[in-house]
Each structure stands twice: as structure tokens, then as C-alpha cells.
Amino acid sequence: MAVIKEKAECCTLLVDELYGQLPARVYATLFQRGKLSVRLISQFSKLSARQVKNGLCVLQQHNLLFYSVDANSGEAEYSVNHEYAYNLVRTGKILEMVDNSYGPAGRDVMQNLLLLGQTRISDLVAAYQAKINEVNNDDAWLNDKKPELAIKSKAQLNSVLCRLIEAELIDVIHSKTFQSAHEIEKQVHREVMDVYFSNGIKGTKAKIEFEQRVAEGLRKVREESKTLKRKLAQNGGASKRRKLAVGNETNGAPEEEEDLDPALDPRQVIRINYEKCIVELRSRRLVQYVNETLGETTGYVYGQLLKQLTKNISRCKSDPLIDALTPEEKVTPSVTTNEILDKVKTSIDLTLGIGKIPSKSISKSAAERLTPLAPKDKIPFMNQDDSDDDEEDGDYSDSDEEMDTKKENGDAPVARMSRPEQLRQHLLLLAEGHPGFVRHCGEDEWTVDFKPLMENLRATELDSIIEQTSGRQGLRLIRILRTKGKLGEQALQSLSLMRKVDLQQKMLEMRLVGFAHTQEVPRDNKADPKKSIFLWYCDTEQAYSSLIAKCYATMVHCLQVLEVRRQKDKDVLSLAKRTNVKGKEKDMMRDESYARFAKFLKDERLLMAEMMRIDDTLALLQDY
């Protein structure tokens, strides 16, 4: 798959930042030249074969490479896994997400897997056991305070690994893990042709059967990484095992709960599953949107709903070939109100965030409207007329127009509602409005249509960026072009009610940043530019691509500035790394040196925060 220049540069700098210059040089060569053998990498990078192998070893350990063995020469050829390389920038977000969901123990395990790369379970257990033995050795901590361990026993480590494997945040390395999607597809194609179509594909029916068998083969390859999860599912999920233990009069102590989990095969090699991590980060981002727009209580309810819905969602974007299902299999996952209520903590006050208006002022037909089917795929920008949408929403009672808005969220007495009814009010609130965070798909059943929801949020993000870059006038002009299509300058001027000079200046400004484009239409066959008509138009996909490239370029700039600052303050940073200075910089360093060190740390935090903010935009535009 082709990678834009800015992303290739960003991934190379991230590898350099985390793993050093040698792996980064090898990675940059693979980005520039494509699939290469060790001999060719050495030739193009001017590195020795030994250096190349050392660099490849580091990259392979952290799943940053694909490789395949050439059938003719017998040489292994390597190519970049750019998705895993870019996901290195999301390490902090992933650890924070795991900490919130699985506690410090889960965070500690994920952090070690991120640092170590692919790891055999027995090696991970041995490393933790050595650390536990070291801390439990009282003689080693006579004068120092004994550190607190997140993982205190092998049983706890096994239990945490089981939780993370069941959540698909960790998956298993198998024989085809290090083959690219293109190589796997070619291999499955060959196998299907050899087994089922040795005489060739003849006719439409045979072609459909061929595609189905290829999809089935690719699905089997993808499921190989879920072997540990399937074994755990055979013993029942974590909650089921605890319920069975309670039924057998187990006292529910944490140590005994850990012993309920089956021992994992120590020979299995595991790694971080970034696809599932991105699904969890998407849920986290959606909850943040709801917190900002509808309040924290509604956001908490939405978080519990997403947690239930995404249990069996392994990736944000489905593969059109592998995930092609028959109409009978296309069942949208949904959750009931009671299932969500079971997960909501009793300490959460569900009355918060609900409007206080009389029930007679609410249109039941509109509020309780069901939408059994997901909306058809639409381009968000093509539906600009809100009045048409309002007419299609349903029949509203006349009392809606006469509603006393002063009583909303005011001091009017709140009608007594049961806890399930309070929860339903939050869910109905989520189902209303333009983004459509939730769809009321059945009687007390709720689902989320992620594809149209994310399209709407992308459109909102693009509008926000256009407004910040080109102002309100620029956003207004772009919306006119989206609604009306291609327009000449005179027609655009009459619709926008702007002066010609201001219009030309604003459109030129937006053309330079990639939000607006022009098309030349000649009046005759001579195509004389002086006699041609120039039409303005807005290409949304092109605007997305331009914005994504600029985001990568900005991240590259941040990493380059950080490296320049490191070189500038190299003497101070080397002093701060000394064992007798580390942790006591203010006491051990001179005032001038400490001021430089503190300024560097502040600038580093600002640059990292800027990269995280840009990554939020990138994730929304291309990953979610």
C-alpha cells in the first residue's frame, strides 16, 4: 500500500525517537525503496550486513516489519508495517485507557508489552517473578523504602493477562502474523485456485463462489490470532467464572478469584492488538464528545453502552472482502436498557443532566420514535436544509411550540421516576440531535451506527478547522459551494453577498490551503485562458487528504524541533542523566543549568501535547 511522504517521514522519526538511529536508517531505506532483502538494504543504506540484521531484529521484535521468503532466491524480503509504526505515538493514550478500564495492574502489563514487543508468556512470567523476588528480599531494602508492585504474584499476572486477552487488547502471534495483507491475500488466492478451481473460473456463479471461498480463507487466517481467547471462552468468561465460584460458596477474595482463571500456555507468544486498542480509543473519544455536549452523567451512560456494544467489535473499519456477510448475517448488535443498567454504578445519580419539564409538554410520538434500520450512507455535507429533516422526524404535538422554556433545567418539581426510566431519558437524549450518538432500534433496544456517526463528526471537525483557518466568511463560502455545487465567481458573489475583491481574496486564501479548488471550462475548442470560465468547487475528500498530509507534516516538525532542542541542551541533559543527579536535579544542579533543564522539560511537554492533539484529529479523519 502506498504511503504519503509526510507519513513515511513521521514514522521514521518515531522509530528514531524510540529505538535509535540504526533501526530508523533501515526503516527509512525500506520506505524509500519498498520490499528489500538484507543484501539490498545494506547496499542502499550504506550499512554493513551485521548492522542491517541488528536493526531488522529490533524492528521485527516490535512488529514494525512484514517479511516474506522469495520462492526463487530463498531470501527473506522485508517491508514496513507503517500502521504499527505510527501507533507508537498513541502509547500514552493506550496506557491511560487500560488504566481506567483494568487498573494499575493492567496498565503495568500493557506497558511492559509495549516496551518488550512480542513476548513469550513464560518469559513475561519469569521477568515478573524475578522482580517480585527482588522486592520481597528484605535485605536489599534496609535503608530504602520498598517499592509497591502493581503485580504481586504469578496468579495475578495470569488473571490480568486473561482479562486483556478476553478484551482482545492482546492477541497471539501465528505463522502469518508477519506477512502483509497483500501477501496473505495472494497466498489464499493460490490455495483456493489449487483446491477448488484447478480448471479455472468459468461463469458468474463460479466467480461468486471463488470470492466467498477467498473471504472464508482470509477470515480463518484472521481468527488464528484469537486462539487464546477461544480457549478462555470455552471455560466461560471472567464474569461467568466468578458467578460459578459464588454459587459454589467461594468467599470472593481477590486471591481466590485470580485462581479461577485457567493457566495460559507458557509457549504462546503475545503482542499488543492495536486494532482493538483503536476501537477503545474511539469509544473514549465519543464519550468525550457527549461529555462536552450533553453532560458528564449522559457521557457515563454512553460509555457503558459503548462498552457493551464493542465487546465483539475487533476493528473500526471492516474489510469489504473479509467482512462481506449474507443478508441473514447482517444483524446489527444492540443492547437493552436493563443490560446497560446492570453496568451502571449505583453511586451514579441518573437524575443529573435530565431536563425538568412537565410530561404533558413532551411529544411521546417523537421522543419514543423507533428507527429499526440504520440510515443509508449519505454524504454529511449534502443535507444542509434542516427544515426538511425536521418535517421527516415525525408528528410533534402543538404543545411543543407552547413549551415554557423558563422551566427547563430550572426549579420546577421533578416527577418521580424509577431508575430504569431515568436511564431511558439519558438514552433518548443521546438518540436525539444531529450527530445521532445512539439509535433507538427496538423496544428498549439501543445501538450505535458508527459509520454515519463518524462521518458527521468528521464533517464537524473539518468545518471547525475551516472556520479557524479562514474565518466565518470562509466557512460560509464553502457551505454555499457544497450546497450549490460548482459556481462561477459572479454567481458565488451574488449568493454570498460579498464584495468582489473580498471574495477573490478569501477564495484564493482557501485555495492555497486546499479547501477550495478551481476548474477551467473553455468556451471554444481553442481553449484560450482569456476566454475560459473558471468555476469554484469544494472537493471534501481532497480537503481531507490535504488536511491529513498537513497533520503529518506538523508532527514531523514537532519531532524535529524536539531533536534540535536536545542537541542544544545536550550538556544539561547528560548531567541530568547521572545516577547521583537523577531525581534531585534542583538540589544538585546549578541555578542556570537547572533553569535550562526545566525550560527544556516544559518545551518537551508542549511539543508532545501538540502531537497528541494532532493525533486526535488524524484518528478522527482516517482511523475511526
Curated annotation (Swiss-Prot):
Compartment(s) where it occurs, according to its Swiss-Prot or TrEMBL record: Nucleus
Composition-biased stretches (Acidic residues): 385-403
Task performed by this protein: DNA-dependent RNA polymerase catalyzes the transcription of DNA into RNA using the four ribonucleoside triphosphates as substrates. Specific core component of RNA polymerase III which synthesizes small RNAs, such as 5S rRNA and tRNAs.
Organism of origin: Neurospora crassa (strain ATCC 24698 / 74-OR23-1A / CBS 708.71 / DSM 1257 / FGSC 987)
GO molecular function annotation: single-stranded DNA binding
Family indicated by similarity: Belongs to the RNA polymerase beta chain family.
Record protein name field: DNA-directed RNA polymerase III subunit rpc-3
Region annotation Leucine-zipper: where it falls in the sequence: 551-572
Subunit-structure text: Component of the RNA polymerase III (Pol III) complex consisting of 17 subunits.
